[in-house]
Amino acid sequence: MTATPGAVPEVPPIRLDYPTLGIDMPVIPTGVTEDGQMEIPGDAATAGWYRYGKAPADAVGHTVIAAHNSSPDTPVGPLNAIAGSRTGDEIRVEDSAGHDYTYRVLSVEHVNKNELNLEPYFSRDATPRLVLVTCGGEWVPERNTYSDNVIVIAEPLT
């Protein structure tokens, strides 16, 4: 995921709760790797929030939260389940100030990584959205990754 740093919001998300899929996981701020990709926590049990993007309390822009779908310590990560997201599902995000933000799923996309343009998902000035991202599709051993990204887009309710 290619990302470009911007200003850092003051109140980061700390927890992601998606009851329909049994997801309840911590979220930590992450940045950008040396090759310009969004940094993802090594353990699939923890999600990363793109700290140069928008936070749930922001009036505009996308809040991007991503996690690996598996890792050595967590063979099946919680975000692996987002492939089963359905339009209308509710997702809750808690921030470090203790505020809860509820979102409703608008879409779930399965996009081949070779065809993926992530720039629109990282928008800082678009209509507020929650964007969840993980890997999906088939394992590609020669690339040491999966063939697709699974991307869930949700709109704020509160």
Regions inferred by a protein language model and the residue ranges of each:
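Solvent-exposed, non-transmembrane regions of membrane-associated and secreted proteins
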Residues: 1-85, 90-97, 107-158
